[in-house]
Amino acid sequence: MPKFDVAKHDLERLVGKEFTVDEWEDLFLYAKCELDDIWEHEGKIYFKADAKDTNRPDLWSAEGIARQVRWALGMLRGLPRYSIEESNVMVYVDENLKDIRPYGVYAIVEDLELDEEALKQIIQLQEKVALTLGRKRKEVAIGTFDFDKLSPPFYYKAVEPQKIKFIPLNCEREMSADEILEEHEKGKEYGHLIKGRPYYPLLVDSEGNVLSMPPVINSETHGKVTEETKSIFIDITGWNLETIMLALNVIVTALAERGGKIRTVRVIYKDFELKTPDLTPKEFEVDLNYIKRLAGVELTDKDIKDLLERMMYEVDFVDRRVKLRYPAFRNDIMHPRDVLEDVLIAYGYNNIEPEEPELAVQGKGDDFVDFENAIRDLMVGFGLQEVMTFNLTNREAQFDKMNIPEEDIVEIENPISQKWSALRRWLLPSLMEFLSQNTHEEYPQRIFEVGKATLIDESRETKTISESKLVVAIAHPKVTFTEAKEILDSVLRHLGAEYTIREIEYGSFIPGRAGEIIVEGKKVGIIGEIHPQVLENWGVEMPVAAFEIFLRPFYKGSFL
């Protein structure tokens, strides 16, 4: 979880009221933070805040905490209002960045009065947002510049590395792009995000002055922000527009809390145009009875409205529904329980009387888990070895290497590694990878796994369903379809199921040696001999026969 430093005197000038240290310890809870440490320096008190929610970057600074406290105490209510004026400033985005770092969003904040503490908070907030929300700058990189020292319009360009030279931040000499990546502290840390690309991203002004080389480093000589800076130009780049727009909203509203005036920037892409930032409030709706039923305390309609307004919501009641508008610097409201959480934060968890449950509860194993374990025991009894592989995978493993067309799968929005960028929709690719990593071991190799596959299901609240499956793979020089079918036959016989196999053509299997497994007219699995192309894709040197079946249809239907 993010940890960050704030000064007591800075918080209090932003709130407009003084508090004791003990009072601050309670007030931090409104901002989903805890006090991790307290110390004194040159007669001033400082706090180290430990954020308890990685989905609230708006709370990772003195400005965000002070804003939350003002609303929670009822000093202000409802939706925060930020005035935004248009500017004639434009940024042109190079289409050649589409495979390097395709998106940039921008803003200007004017009329600032900065001191040492305010400057520390700006820099710290940038770093925390880029580190956590930005996945160490992979998804979000932030630059801030003294706007009065720049010459708009600006150009977010794709430039050949050998043509790049400028003085990077905290340096005294001009360096080439390669020198920056190899010698500069930030180049060593973040250079891998662009190194080896035919072009590097570069932000320049109309006079060709380099402002930054995102996501690595800013320029030392053009636009460095100091305590004398009155207007800040903000540049945020990344791979996902929604994510970098959120980051921009967090930064500009934090600066607005210090009296800054926000101005928009026109961002010109080849095929579309944006005006950023966009602080249009977001909307959500929740059943009023849901809140009352689950809150655990007696709340009237008026109570709920009051509590939500103290958490920066604009509230309307329509036919027992609560229609809400909330700030654009939040993206964590995804379910009614998120609204309920805010109600209880405003109410105060410390004000809820603990109750000891009256029901005696005795724990027991989940019946379906017991069923899965019985399947495992059965497979071991057939002489197979159990393996346990990861639920996370990638499109290449699920489709390309298995020689089948791509389909919709559940993907991770911000994966740390492309190898682990999706949830698997079937288990056989995982066993093929296992076999590919054990070609040096003795054959035959007869393995199985009981594991989860995640499928798209639009009818469900989460739009997905997790299915338990059994997969078996057998590898040796003389393996055939028949050997896999014999194991399948034994499994289904023990489960009390009659089945048929309907021949199909499927890219993962040899034509004429693949089939769907049908039970009571429904497809429950697939069986076949692995296609030579698939074996080659995985680097598996032996023939393989395999099958995979859903387990849920057989639950409660067998002696197990």
Curated annotation (Swiss-Prot):
Which residues bind Mg(2+) per the record? D332, D338, E341, D342
| GO BP of this protein | phenylalanyl-tRNA aminoacylation
Names of the cofactor(s) = Mg(2+)
EC numbers listed for it are 6.1.1.20
Task: Enumerate the catalysed reactions.
Answer: tRNA(Phe) + L-phenylalanine + ATP = L-phenylalanyl-tRNA(Phe) + AMP + diphosphate + H(+)
Molecular function as annotated in GO: ATP binding; magnesium ion binding; phenylalanine-tRNA ligase activity; RNA binding
- The B5 domain sits at 279-354
Q: Which InterPro entries match?
A: aa-tRNA-synth_II/BPL/LPL, B3/B4_tRNA-bd, DNA-bd_dom_put_sf, Phe-tRNA-ligase_IIc_bsu, Phe-tRNA-synth_IIc_bsu_arc_euk, Phe-tRNA_synthase-like_B3/B4, Phe_tRNA_ligase_beta2_arc, PheRS_beta_core
- Positions the record marks as coiled coil are none
Instruction: State the CDD domains in the record.
Output: PheRS_beta_core (cd00769)
What Pfam families would the database entry show?
B3_4, B5, tRNA_synthFbeta
Q: Which PANTHER family match?
A: PHENYLALANINE--TRNA LIGASE BETA SUBUNIT, PHENYLALANYL-TRNA SYNTHETASE BETA CHAIN AND LEUCINE-RICH REPEAT-CONTAINING PROTEIN 47
Q: Which family does it belong to?
A: Belongs to the phenylalanyl-tRNA synthetase beta subunit family. Type 2 subfamily.
Cited HAMAP family:
Phe_tRNA_synth_beta2 (MF_00284)
List the protein's name: Phenylalanine--tRNA ligase beta subunit
